[in-house]
């Protein structure tokens, strides 16, 4: 997994609340057996049926910082929702509230989910309305988003922050313990199954 320390990209205003995982990626797109290629399913119902949807606007097609309404990622536990956001190019999502399971899945996959006050979300929406295509710099080390002259703090779980800054997914965490695993396996009787 790639380390996340700082990222600069175009902010995308998703001015909707209660966006559940089925809206992020409908179930019809969940039939793949790989973890990639889900970008076509991202918000597909809105992208297909609403020509004015934010991701249908040229200004935001290459956006990588999603500024969403409250209660983002609710509904069923669906890792595919995180993968779709990342495959599309998003590196960070900010909201005033996330579903816990979505936040956990995001952190494990390398997608930052930062929590801001709703008033700060609305301020960023206003700035993006005034300056479409506004670039934002997400600084995970200092837990800030800089948009023009505006600096906004965000919260993130300390453990997820550490994992993102170290670039550690579950496999990476396990590989940090390879010496201990090998020492344990060396002591196990040969007739027992090996973890290596």
Curated annotation (Swiss-Prot):
Keyword Amino-acid biosynthesis in record: yes
Any one Gene Ontology cellular component term annotated for this protein: 3-isopropylmalate dehydratase complex
Keyword Amino-acid biosynthesis: yes
Enzyme kind, highest EC tier: lyase
Gene3D superfamilies referenced in this protein's UniProt entry, alphabetically: Aconitase, domain 4
Catalytic activity: (2R,3S)-3-isopropylmalate = (2S)-2-isopropylmalate
GO biological process entries: L-leucine biosynthetic process
Pfam family, one: Aconitase_C
Keywords: Amino-acid biosynthesis, Branched-chain amino acid biosynthesis, Leucine biosynthesis, Lyase
Domain of life, per lineage: Bacteria
Enzyme Commission (EC) number: 4.2.1.33
InterPro entries membership: 3-IsopropMal_deHydase_ssu, Aconitase/3IPM_dehydase_swvl, AconitaseA/IPMdHydase_ssu_swvl, IPMI_Swivel, LeuD
Pathway: Amino-acid biosynthesis; L-leucine biosynthesis; L-leucine from 3-methyl-2-oxobutanoate: step 2/4
GO molecular-function terms, A-Z: 3-isopropylmalate dehydratase activity
Record family assignment: Belongs to the LeuD family. LeuD type 1 subfamily.
Subunit description: Heterodimer of LeuC and LeuD.
Record-given protein name: 3-isopropylmalate dehydratase small subunit
Organism: Corynebacterium efficiens (strain DSM 44549 / YS-314 / AJ 12310 / JCM 11189 / NBRC 100395)
This protein's encoding gene: leuD
